[in-house]
Amino acid sequence: MGKRRRGKQEIDNLTKKQKKHLKEFGEQHPFHDKVVERPEKTQILRLPDSPQRPEPDSEDDSDAEQPSAYQKLLSTMIQGDEDDVESEDEESEEEDNEEEAEVEGDSEEEVEDTDEEDGNDAEEVLEDKVEETSDKLQKKHPEKTNGDVEENEEAEMEGEFTDKKNEAAFCLETNMPAEGEENTAQQEQDEDMFVKHQEIELSEEEVGRISQGSKVKTQVKWAKLGVLQCMCPLERFPAIGQASSAPLPPIHKTLEANWHLLNLPFGAATDVTELQKEMLGLMGTYRDLYLANLSPLKEAKEVRSAYCLHALNHVLKANSRVLRNNAKLKESKNGDEDFRDQGLTRPKVLILVPFRDGALRVVQTFMTLLEPKGKKTDASNKKRFKEEYGEETDEKPPNLQRPDDYHAVFSGNIDDHFRIGMSILRHSMRLYAPFYSSDIIIASPLGLRTVLGAEGEKKRDHDFLSSIELLIVDQADVFLMQNWEHLLHVLEHLNLQPLDSHGVDFSRVRMWNLNNWAAYYRQTLVFSAIQEPQITNILTKHCHNYRGQVCSKTIPKIGSICQVLVQLPHVFQMFHSDSFMDQDARFQFFVDKILPQYRDSVMSHTFIYVPSYFDFVRLRNYLKKEDVSFANISEYSQRSEVSRARHYFQKGEKQFLLFSERFHFYKRYTIKGIHNLIFYGLPTYPHFYSEVCNMLQAGVREGGASVSFTCTALYSRYDVHRLAAITGADRAAQMLQSKKTTHLFITGEEKST
């Protein structure tokens, strides 16, 4: 214990300057070195009156000193990035204090560890500190351990771990096909849509027609996918027919053994389902696809497995073609053969998922599909990946009572800031590959946004998205609940002309990539739990596939209003609006027609549900201005603010409670004390309507049975999808076509009328 206290005391006695130096360089400045009494090894030299003794605040003389072994070690890690070190020296006083606290805490732990093992002096404490500092530097700047990788490539993953060891093993330019793999070219027959799609040549006239957005629309009905709307921009690529006319695409030889085990990762039946067969048939045509109304409890897992197979099949075919052409070029004597089989950058597939758990499940599906017979998939950095993307056992409180769909969406690790690159070669997978060496990038919109940056920023990079051939947007509805602008920002940076060549061999680049036509060849797959105009707008504005688009148009016949259990009159009031984005009309209708009815003190306990946060802020400011008694709860409210608002509203001390939809999405609290319910806008998720209405049961259970409840919902003709999901397709059609602007439904003991 004495040695431990002595080591801790030495750290505590350091000045702030000394601690900062220890933090940055892993050892004390030579002036402050304390030599341990070891007469046989160390000579003690004291110079108390030396006129050349350096001042503690002076760093000029340190450069003249001969660098120690520790400094030489660190210099190899931070070589080429002196600017970053200098910028750290210019940090503010607050950051210095934070570093000081961090050094103290970390050093105390290191002292205890070294004393328990074999620490006899303060030098071992400093040695451990050097190793700790080196690890931190390597994690913060992994690119500095390999000077062969270009700076732009490293900037994308700054502050994150990237795999540098397996660069040569997964390099497409230097690898050759394995034995027996040369004959796999027979798979690439003219009937393979992958080959057709890659080799189609468009004319400038056809590109112009696609850009204009004119499309021929038709409808078909499939057994599982329901009603599908097909939009074709070019006549020579007609619309799809019935499900039987879209057979399963050819599967790459690497996947032949396991592709039928598509549903094995989530413990379902091993056979491919009918839904997956229809999806694979559609995706194999390389048309854009938008499927909505996919329940996270039922179809979500099947959908994930299907698009993982399609993405992996696409990457393996593309890489196999490159490897075969490498062998042909090597055998060619004159070298006159021309093989255009690549894009301007290597990444081919971009998969956007909202949470880390989604990325984990995608990678697990990839591993299952790539697994050779009798062996496990060779995946580098698998342990690190499971640690960073897996769920910690103590993250969620026990006995959390939430709906089943909530647990399905928020299962596992729900961190929404991540990005990871993957390289695929035969049965092997390289996790944490640098983006410019990756075949597949799995990320959240927020994770990519921090790399892409914004206009005018110094550190930004989007070249790795220049040659994306397959874009997959899974759980698009969840992105609406996060930040939709991040997703749009990513879409705006797809298939742009790169600013740097990144070492590409232009003789191998496809002509449509050189012509900046990659956007017309990119396939986009969008999957969502709801029908929403903002999601549909993705395909309208950001997708220009020359093969056209297929969108699901199935509307539920039975609405979520049938799931309301409490006896409640539902009044739907329609207001006139000129466009989907016209929020002024909704606000004026609410202020002029709805709110005055509830200003009377008799109409207390009024709950206002607001889907849009912008509308939430607008209403909050208006209620403050009008001096209305209200409380508010949003996704940005602190826990104490939420508790006070719920208490004041339940006790009647606040007449109104302003409630944002995103808070309900992330928390699913039951609000007690609701007597009057106002939907400022129809909920984004139809089951939210019934969930909020059933909150009135909480008041009934606590003795409020004698209270008469009311419910009012506002809608316009642009809310057709939300209205149909709540009231049902037939009733929604009648309401929109009727000359009346008010419609009444009764739920509870009586049937809805």
UniProtKB/Swiss-Prot annotation:
Residue ranges of the TM segments: none
Annotated segments matching region Disordered: 1-160, 377-402
Listed InterPro entries: P-loop_NTPase, UTP25, UTP25_C, UTP25_NTPase-like
Compartments reported by the entry: Nucleus, Nucleolus
Region (Represses p53/TP53 degradation): 628-689
Major subcellular location class: nucleus
Tissue: Mainly expressed in digestive organs at the later stage of organogenesis. Expressed in liver, gut and exocrine pancreas, but not in the islets.
Chain intervals with Acidic residues compositional bias: 80-126, 148-160
Gene3D superfamilies the UniProt entry points to: P-loop containing nucleotide triphosphate hydrolases
Residue(s) carrying Phosphoserine: S50, S58, S62, S87, S92
Skewed-composition ranges (Basic and acidic residues): 23-43, 127-137, 377-388
Disruption phenotype: Confers hypoplastic digestive organs and selectively up-regulates the expression of the Delta113p53 isoform but not p53, resulting in compromised organ growth in def mutant fish. Loss of function affects sympathetic neuronal development.
Pfam families membership: Utp25_C, UTP25_NTPase-like
Function (record text): Component of the ribosomal small subunit processome for the biogenesis of ribosomes, functions in pre-ribosomal RNA (pre-rRNA) processing. Essential for embryonic development in part through the regulation of p53 pathway. Required for the expansion growth of intestine, liver and exocrine pancreas, but not endocrine pancreas. May not play a major role during the early stage of endodermal organogenesis. Also involved in the sympathetic neuronal development. Triggers the degradation of p53/TP53 and Delta113p53 isoform in a ubiquitination pathway independent way.
Similarity remark: Belongs to the UTP25 family.
Protein name, entry field: U3 small nucleolar RNA-associated protein 25 homolog
Organism annotation: Danio rerio
Lineage: Eukaryota, Metazoa, Chordata, Craniata, Vertebrata
